[in-house]
Amino acid sequence: MAWSQLEVTKAHVAYSCVGIFSSIFSLVSLFVKEQLYIGESMVASIFGLIVGPHCLNWFNPLSWGNTDSITLEISRILLCLQVFAVSVELPRKYMLKHWVSVTMLLVPVMTSGWLVIALFVWILVPGLNFPASLLMGACITATDPVLAQSVVSGTFAQKVPGHLRNLLSCESGCNDGLAIPFVFLSLDLLLYPGRGGQIVKDWICVTILWECIFGSILGCIIGYCGRKAIRFAEGRHIIDRESFLAFYLILALTCAGFGSMLGVDDLLVSFFAGTAFAWDGWFAAKTHESNVSNVIDVLLNYAYFVYLGSILPWKDFNNPDIGLDVWRLILLSLVVIFLRRIPAVLSLKPLIPDIKSWREAMFIGHFGPIGVGAVFAAITSKSQLESHLTNEETPLKDTPGRGSKHWQVMACIWPITCFSIMTSVIVHGSSVAVIMLGRYLSTVTLMALPTGRTTNTKNAWLERLPALDKSGRPFSLQRLDKEPSLSPGQIGGRTSGMVATPKLGMRQRWRQKLQDNKEIEPDIEMNNFCQGTFQIRKETHASTNDSHGTTTANLGTSNGRAQGLPWRSKMNIIDRAEAVNTIYGLDKLAEDTENKDVWRVNTSRIPGIRSPYDDVYTYQSDSSSIGSIERQRIKSLREQEQQAYIAYTEDDQVIIENRQGEILEYVKFHKEGLGDAESGLHNHDRPKRAISPPLEKLHQITNEARKNKYYAYKVGNDLVIEDESGEVFRRYRISPHGGKRKIKKIINPVSSVLSSVGITKPRGVSERINHYLLHSEDEMADDEAESENDMDYEDSDGPASRFKDHAD
């Protein structure tokens, strides 16, 4: 060139191409993903095709050297990082709680997809025998964790239920490693035909026992040691924040290195290492607000799919010499999209606990993207076939030509895999399935704090709740609108604690009222309730006019109410999210009859203002010990896992999840009858319980428009929740009890719900309330045993300071 400063190299051009694409796409990424519904993998692959050797030839990785070797190692690193990240982000002890669902997706569903693809490859591609077709099917059977991120993370994830996101994440992270047994079984059948003993010995002893089982154990050891090491370093304050956040990336590289050196399944090593590393949820809680992993994943995805788009074998997609034609590949792609997973998942839906409806089964069956994992499996298979033909290091730079043993298999495996990947990128990367699922889901985010949109700040709605301002005062909560479902002679009210019985008894008092007022309707209680409501409206109207000089707009309600309705300003205005959260929590509280201990209520603190010590629960006896602090942290995590976060409806059911995507309640409404149809409340860890028909209003709220408002106010000791039209959804009576009891301090998940209606939850509750939660006594024992092991690696200052940071 004229000037030596302008001389460029291939590497410099590659850096520029990847950098330009990443910069431009990052600037419009939200528009592309939200408005065009296109994922970054599709756009990056198209860009790689344009600048690659097939179009502009600016970016040509085929001229860098051994392309297969480069692609294999890049795919290995990307997969190990992504698989480790997926396992770390799962809820704590996820594999222990959901192993049935994960196993059903990994074993029967993968096996079915493998056999179906192999059958159609054998039919469509001439010249390939069935073992070779099994090898083709094994390469494109696994679900890719990189492409699955378009559903399990980001803005698209808000349209998918949390339990489905967790299930897809776990499956995509684990089945890439479990594709290795299918690959090597196919290789053994292809390389050792008619030698059953050799096939069984190699597959069981080498593939299953060494590569898979020992690889999983090795991953657990690496993850466990890494967890202990980072907790020790953090407890001694010898690790900085940057290294703390990057530590899991370092562990992922460690898994890739040791797995490759020992000849085990490095993807399984990475997955189980991440699972063991984040088993107790401590690391996830520490890095909850950090997005370092997401940033690194995005950069790697941009670069990888630009690279992949530039090396696609476009000429081989229509190459009759190796038995491939475009129409054959199109038919095979349709089989992969529609028959690989959907029939198996639909048929096994009753056996998968985490799939609650046929629509969810259809979504899980459809969303099985093929991507980086298929590239890794295809090049690994090709390398193994080449190793039986030469003593050179594999994979080879050039594929053996016609006449070599298994030459057609080695020539077809890469084009078939790449065509399947591009089809999956187009279908799954566009996220059409996610958008369609979101149209049928009516979701509502549950918040634990009031919105604070009251217009009369002088009379906060906390002040209008029952006067339970004495700390430690017991109370009972009873639903007044609940239809009687108990047999005569049983107690009619279900309370949260001690039953408050009047001196004369409820029936005697009622008979006395009937005798004294025979000409008056028997619903005296409701008349008093209406009088109290009218008095609130009257007083609020006066206070509103005095303080603001304005009235609310005419809402046009019925039921004989005033047209202006200025009394609304005194009520607490809540949206439908908070209404669902309040009703859900208070119904659960009112129906709890197994716990006979009395709760203590404290309404001295304004709701919405959290104390930095709210998440720290201490015992009076051993509050300063390290073991107690660790147990308190675990109890705090368990409490957070029981807080309702989102509810959504699907067909005739309401599913309530926590922030981690775990299902708290599963409410199914049977539509067989009109008014007397019974409802069932199902929980995957609890037996079936009956609920009253008024709970169907929860189903109604979640299906309403998001702009609807609801009102919560107090009339005497009654807590009322109603909508804009005046329909009362719930009435609760909070009955204070006499006397006090000393109760050991513990926690209950209904605290956040009580806080949302102005009642600060008891600082004390019997520990037997934990039996009501999803966790069993065995899990609690495991948590406590695990906390005792972690005590040895922490000093008295470290855990306390870290726990305080977590509480903040």
UniProtKB/Swiss-Prot annotation:
Family membership: Belongs to the fungal Na(+)/H(+) exchanger family.
Functional note: Sodium export from cell, takes up external protons in exchange for internal sodium ions. Seems to be poorly expressed.
The entry's keywords: Antiport, Glycoprotein, Ion transport, Membrane, Sodium, Sodium transport, Transmembrane, Transmembrane helix, Transport
Subcellular location as annotated: Membrane
Entry-linked InterPro entries: Cation/H_antiporter_C, Cation/H_exchanger_TM, Na+/H+_antiporter_fungi, Na+/solute_symporter_sf, Nha1
Membrane association type: Multi-pass membrane protein
UniProt name for this protein: Na(+)/H(+) antiporter 2
A GO cellular component entry from the record: plasma membrane
Biased composition (Acidic residues): 779-797
Residues modified by glycosylation: 291, 545, 602
UniProt feature, compositional bias: Polar residues: 542-561
Species of the source: Zygosaccharomyces rouxii
One Gene Ontology biological process: regulation of membrane potential
GO terms, molecular function: potassium ion transmembrane transporter activity; sodium:proton antiporter activity
Region (Disordered), start-end ranges: 478-499, 541-562, 774-808
Domain of life of the source: Eukaryota
Transmembrane segments annotated in the record for this chain: 12-32, 36-56, 70-90, 105-125, 128-148, 174-194, 203-223, 244-264, 267-287, 294-314, 319-339, 361-381, 409-429, 432-452
